[in-house]
């Protein structure tokens, strides 16, 4: 039996505890030796029961905190029920838990989900020293009345620390002196826009929160230093130290300020003071997140507003910005002439009050993202439809817009300028670099950082080329896939559709009401067909089911009835089930990718870890998820002196691996797993511990309904999931494993719909592999250190035979050194080896011409290769681009985490029905559908591992276009290599779904001299089928005499091994796995056993490597041989498939090591 033990991890005493106990939500045996009868009780009852038992046995320690939090939440929920008369919804429970935990955050939910009720009830619960800030006096009076109804002692219009104070932004600004360092318990901001827009108001809020002036100024200074020096040649150690000092000062004060909650915001902070406030509070005000749409989208090809007459009262007309204020007045008058009461929705709230009360029929406003008509109206019963007068657009002067490198690139390409030299430099820019370049170009200032200054000069040159080229154009309109360039009165403008304004504005007609989403109607009066088509395309990418229906094809009478019906008390609305969750992934990039995929997430920083809150809509199911990265493994086998290298093997055969939290030294960057508070390598106390992540995850798990663990879909990912589930189960009993093989909306939704239990067979396989690696590695490494008197010696079961291959080839290569003549025959190379230089000279002198005869020729069918597996991708990338395996894996990891390819650690060539559809879609786009031949390649269950393939039907050129149009869409920084590898994966996959090609195989006789004939068969032609996407190398040798090109170099009759050779051997001999190919070679290099040749990337053994291998193979051949390693790999696979018992395999390994190693330890000649 294997009994996993976690060091210092009991949720009560902090002692050692088994994984089984943690998964059952129990403390360790020392705290609670025996208990039964609580397995089937709910989580809250279990916590209470355990608390009482621990308390009665005088064992209560840290478990008190868990009990306190649970009971506090219960108290707050009961108070809410008593005050409101109903049970809080799942989302309200999430907010109440955060509030009760004294967290500062933004409520990013739309109106109708109980934000105001939650905040008011909690304010009354606290009872005093609460400040509730609202934008207007009328809203202040409404809030005061509601608070009084809930039973609060209210101070309306001024601050009284013994009451709940409700004030306006105006009061905050006018009473600066009286609010300095009041530091109330709880501060609510109903509408954060006034704070975000005004630096002065931010100053006042900072004072109110109790933030000392010097701490606030330090935050401002820190932001300025980061902005100034991040890309500067003056980013010295002195500047870095100053930044560290400021960060430390701010971190020490963060938990000492008032709790701040922002109920809503429509814009994000941009000013330096607002960014300082974000730094101090740990979160930024985020805009209301879109949960779902229930809207009929329509359009008409004219600007006729007479439709208002048919639709009647309850409309909002949004006028495209370029028409100006005069058009708003003109439309208002037109509507009034139709017999309706109309009012401009430009500023203030009076228009909304009148509209709500039925005094106004139609509102007229500007289609502006920041306008009150687009963001400030929430009238679910009254507002039924929105009419856009003109397609909503963003219009800017073209030459100003060209200061953005990505805009310059897109415009340049559109007008035919060759940007090939500049493209890759622009594509790899991060957001900060783009901003710095933009502002330096606009201001005409140089950049104190050579690389960016050089790029700025190049951008200025290309800007002048674009301007000159535009002057040559006779057309007044230039159209691209994502924007339009127009010429008006001699000036050029760039125009984009404003999709966000369309979404927000049309969303005014579809609001949450009585737990359901009302039906809305949106009509665009199209004034620019090109811009409308771009908008339609963008909308369909975001909401695939979106369809814009021509107004002439709609039944307005029927729509009007449906609009009215959805606003009745028991009307037909779209109802949702909202649940809250914590989604844990491995990497920060993946967390960001998933969060951005579904909505514009809000971010808060907890314990220096970003927590993304996002909304995932799946039909009528809505998930409000916190997404956090564990950063891979959180524990590893302990380095403490326990058992045999951290694993106890007991007399009854029980195996107890002890795991300790992973720590990273921030000075030497080494990683270790022990209880030590100092780095064992350099002695530094500047450490980063996984305990910080665990504490955060436990805190978040307490606040949500469910925990979803979404680590990678392999044995390592399963072990990570097991560890996380162990640490979190005492805090939330609803812990699930979710698995996906690609990061796409469809895959994430499918994973959430089908949560699973953790696969303990995969976990056991990983545990056996890790223990075996520890035992073999530590045992042999210590013997090597003794033998060779040095550090950085290591050995492993897989590494050693691989080292042996490279050592043997290196020795043979060196022993057969001589001279090599390369003869180039029209692109086909012939290699000749000579041991002596004089023979080379003789050969060259006799080689005057080469005579080529074509002996035969035949037509053959060429089959496409299967899509890539891990090994074939590494081999192809090395052969084609000479890239090392670890770099290819790093790039593939980036592409996977960006959602561009499926999981890259796979040995399957299987292609799912989803993958086949992607190939079909692409071939249809490229007019190659006749070549489509669907292949699954190998049978497998749907949802199982697939080959490496793209997740969408976009080739590398379309990907580049996407990056140009939206540089911040992906959460990775692209390089030229990312594009090369993506292109390789994409083309190989598409080719695998295409028809055979027809080739010509030709046999040639090449006569190089007397008795020196070379007979070769070469592919001389290939066409049709998959060749159209994935060309193959062909040789078309000319018949007759030619003058060959000759190159002479030192060389050997033996060939060294390349990366691709080693990976092929690992695969064929059964000792490699997708997760170990690159890592094995990388580890051999780290130990200094092998090096890679610069020009051809051959792997060469060093003298150190040769000595180590000779020692290991002579003393431990049976332990590290190919056959033994291959058998172990098979056993690990069998454990994962539940065919073998894990503890049996480990006991065999332990016996094997003891038998071979113990006698050697006593030898004097080690």
UniProtKB/Swiss-Prot annotation:
ZnF (RG N-terminal-type) ranges: 1-40
InterPro entries: DEAD/DEAH_box_helicase_dom, Helicase_ATP-bd, P-loop_NTPase, Reverse_gyrase, Topo_IA_2, Topo_IA_cen, Topo_IA_cen_sub1, Topo_IA_cen_sub3
Record comment: activity regulation: At least one of the 2 proteins is inhibited by actinomycin D. Less sensitive to NaCl than TopR1, maximal positive supercoiling is observed with 100 mM NaCl; as NaCl rises higher than 400 mM supercoiling decreases. At 600 mM NaCl relaxes but does not introduce positive supercoils into negatively supercoiled substrate.
Ranges of residues in domain Toprim: 580-743
Cited function: Modifies the topological state of DNA by introducing positive supercoils in an ATP-dependent process. A highly processive enzyme, it introduces a large number of positive supercoils directly in a negatively supercoiled substrate. At 75 degrees Celsius introduces more than 23 positive supercoils into pTZ18R DNA (probably 2860 bp), more than TopR1; unlike TopR1 little to no relaxation of the negatively supercoiled substrate is seen in the presence of ATP, in the absence of ATP no activity is seen. At 45 degrees Celsius the enzyme is slower and in vitro individual steps can be detected.
Temperature dependence: Optimum temperature is 70-75 degrees Celsius, between 60 and 80 degrees Celsius high levels of positive supercoils are seen in vitro. Active at 80 degrees, much less active at 88 degrees Celsius in vitro.
Domain of life: Archaea
Binding site for Zn(2+) 1: 10, 13, 28, 31
Region (Topoisomerase I), start-end ranges: 576-1166
Cofactor entry: Zn(2+); Mg(2+)
Domain notes: Both the DNA unwinding and positive supercoiling activities require the cooperation of both domains. The cooperative action between the helicase-like and the topoisomerase domains is specific. The helicase-like domain probably does not directly unwind DNA but acts more likely by driving ATP-dependent conformational changes within the whole enzyme, functioning more like a protein motor.
Protein's UniProt keywords contain Disulfide bond: no
Gene behind the chain: rgy2
Name of the featured protein: Reverse gyrase 2
